Amino acid sequence: MCSFCNQNKITGQIYQPTPLEVERILDKAASDLGERTKNAEIAFFGGSFTAIDRTYMLSLLDAAKKFRDKFCGIRISTRPDYIDKEILDILKSYGVTSIELGAQSMSDDVLLANDRGHSAESVFKSSQLIKSYGFSLGLQMMTGLYKSDIQKDLYTAETFVKINPDTVRIYPTVIMKDTKLAELYLNGEYTPYSLEKSVNLCSRLIELFEKNNIKIIRLGLHYSDSLVNNSYGDNYHPAFKELCENKLFYDKFIEKAKDFLDLNEIKTVVINSKSLSKFLGQKRSNVKKLNELGYDFSVCFDDTLQKYELYLK
């Protein structure tokens, strides 16, 4: 098992659903969502889908296939070393549309230290195979793993860009109890990134992926009582993505301000109207920090700007 993995406590789920339960869940979802199902996917997450018992996997796909025409697709998450042509032929025949790979890192030494059981090369090969079959490809990475560092995390993200997935998920490492990582932490052999360090890094990753038109569909773990009650450290934050977006806008402002000889020349910040809360920061934290530095400005909108774009005038 991976050094960091305790899926039951991460997801709060301690049982495997039966095919009948899957059908009931999907039937209720289709009823509740109505026309909105056309924008909703059926998703199998919380483990390595193609690594589970084959008969059980096929029974779940059978259940999902009955509802395939009511939803926009079927998405699964799995390991890069459990992808081959036979598996992809099966997934294609059942209407699966998106496959996400838990790559976690593209540094072999980090993968080895965390007992991942696969190499960076297997991520490359499985990604290419998935794309050749016409599936949407998603890649998942973890920052701050045991034996990783900022440069290795940036290398993973930059390598993802070369692979060119459709989507990415970024998960800052959270130390779950009853894992190898927890033992290393308690023995003083592993020090997790601080929340500030994680935010600084992941704000850079947002910009990198956005610049390369790769959609970030998750940044940080979903909140659950089980997650909070069964983890160590204080680097988890339920609004982690928002903190990263706030940091990204703050850094962009400071960088753009360097073009002005006098900070008093800056009268207006121009952003997309949908990005207002991201720019202002939680409890207007960005504005307060900038005011403390001597900046005094108003905000106006230009909705032709990209989500994370701004300029000063």
Listing of model-derived features with the role each one plays in the protein:
Residues G34-N39, D69-F71, L261-E265:
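Short helix-terminating capping/connector loops at secondary-structure junctions
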